[in-house]
């Protein structure tokens, strides 16, 4: 993956995965999904004592990234976890701010004989980015020539100054497993089971540019809201 120049922004894939298969249509916008929690990204826990994990770091210029998780077992067979991640990064260039949020809740239940397992999660997340379309050719030339007025990246002119896009998603997921054999060890790789899954996910993507721009040609010479 090749990242853009700000945290929480898009990633460009430098290769293609020929083994990835999707049985249902996807929304696209793959470059925006690098920080999007997919079904397989959600974790389920089983802990003897309550566990808390905190993560914090500063971002580019102004902003912070934090992620908090707490999980505990109400009894030896039932666990739940709650997590929240928030990120805001101003970026090095004009109109490049990122603002991401993600709330996750998951649970894990096992019967006493471990023949039945029930897991599920709920996720609500949004990934918002200001888009500047890159630095103008004139500003890039002045920066490369070492013009003292253009040493700071934050003063370079960009192609788009009011553009914004956002990807929102909500998902509910449940899975039931009934093990026919091989339940004496949760890590038994020779087990046999039947399962049932339920997945309900909605995604919403919007792109707005309230300032007239000729960057995309006459087809987008007016205000854009798509």
Regions found by a protein language model. Name each.
Residues 68-72, 82, 105-109, 174-180:
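Residues on the lipid-exposed face of transmembrane beta-strands in outer-membrane beta-barrel proteins
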Residues 25-27, 34, 38-70, 91-92:
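Short strand-turn segments of transmembrane beta-barrel domains in outer membranes
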Residues 2, 25, 90-102, 106-168:
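Outer-membrane beta-barrel translocator/channel fold
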Residues 54-58, 84-86, 120-124, 192-206:
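Transmembrane beta-barrel strands of outer-membrane/channel proteins
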Residues 42-49, 76-77, 112-115, 181-192:
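Short loop/turn motifs that connect adjacent beta-strands in outer-membrane beta-barrel proteins
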Residues 154-226:
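Face-selective signature of the C-terminal outer-membrane beta-barrel domain
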Residues 48, 62-66, 99-103, 168-172:
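Residues that define the transmembrane beta-barrel architecture of outer-membrane proteins
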Residues 44-50, 81-88, 142-158, 217-225:
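Flexible, solvent-exposed coil segments and beta strand-coil junctions
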């Amino acid at each position: 993956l090749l990242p853009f120049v700000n945290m929480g922004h898009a990633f460009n894939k430098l290769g293609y995965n020929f083994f990835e298969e999707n049985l249902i249509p996807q929304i696209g916008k793959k470059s925006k999904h690098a920080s999007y929690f997919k079904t397989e990204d959600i974790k389920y826990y089983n802990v003897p004592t309550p566990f808390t994990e905190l993560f914090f770091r500063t971002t580019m210029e102004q902003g912070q990234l934090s992620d908090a998780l707490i999980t505990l077992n109400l009894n030896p067979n039932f666990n739940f976890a709650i997590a929240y991640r928030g990120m805001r990064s101003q970026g090095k260039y004009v109109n490049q701010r990122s603002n991401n949020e993600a709330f996750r809740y998951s649970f894990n239940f096992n019967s006493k004989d471990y023949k039945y397992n029930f897991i599920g999660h709920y996720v609500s997340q949004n990934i918002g980015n200001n888009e500047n379309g890159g630095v103008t050719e004139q500003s890039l030339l002045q920066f490369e020539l070492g013009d003292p007025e253009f040493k700071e990246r934050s003063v370079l002119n960009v192609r788009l100054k009011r553009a914004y896009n956002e990807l929102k998603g909500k998902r509910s997921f449940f899975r039931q497993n009934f093990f026919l054999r091989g339940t004496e060890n949760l890590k038994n790789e020779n087990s046999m089971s039947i399962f049932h899954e339920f997945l309900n996910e909605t995604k919403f993507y919007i792109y707005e540019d309230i300032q007239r721009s000729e960057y995309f040609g006459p087809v987008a010479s007016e205000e854009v809201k798509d």
